[in-house]
């Protein structure tokens, strides 16, 4: 298990180096020139507030397919696409013997994480996104995919100032 975690970490570090190189190249018009515009901080401005991002907390009760790893991966990918976010890395881990899942979609705009307890029909999702991403767009996808009988949703605006 530690080998797979180290391997995941190495892959993530390589992806970050590539992303940094792409950002560095895109920020300049020619070598040694000034950036075309000031760096963007990806904070959100909405209703007169400026904040780091929107953090949604979803609890799904009496939900289906909470032990299906490939399905969970597909659903998370659809959530990322619907939100207009940029997927950097996706990992799902399946626990035995109950088949619970823990997963994370690492995004350029932050993350989506999930933990499931199939024996209880319960799933906990965190969706945190900054910039122009639309985290609320993931909610109907999760409802349709897992068909919960009860859903609770909390919203927290992170980094308000």
Language model regions located:
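Polybasic/polar functional segments that serve as interface/processing modules
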Residues: 1-161
């Amino acid at each position: 298990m530690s080998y797979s975690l180290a391997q995941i970490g190495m892959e993530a570090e390589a992806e970050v180096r590539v992303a940094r190189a792409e950002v560095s190249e895109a920020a300049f018009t020619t070598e040694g020139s000034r950036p075309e515009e000031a760096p963007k901080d990806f904070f959100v401005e909405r209703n007169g507030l400026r904040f780091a991002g929107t953090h949604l907390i979803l609890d799904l009760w009496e939900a289906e397919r909470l032990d299906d790893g490939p399905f969970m991966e597909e659903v998370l990918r659809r959530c990322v696409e619907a939100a207009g976010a940029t997927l950097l890395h996706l990992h799902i881990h399946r626990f035995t013997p109950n088949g619970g899942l823990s997963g994370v979609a690492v995004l350029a705009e932050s993350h989506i994480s999930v933990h499931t307890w199939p024996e209880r029909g319960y799933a906990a999702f965190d969706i945190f996104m900054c910039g122009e991403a639309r985290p609320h767009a993931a909610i109907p996808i999760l409802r349709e995919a897992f068909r919960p009988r009860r859903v609770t949703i909390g919203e927290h605006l992170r980094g308000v100032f």
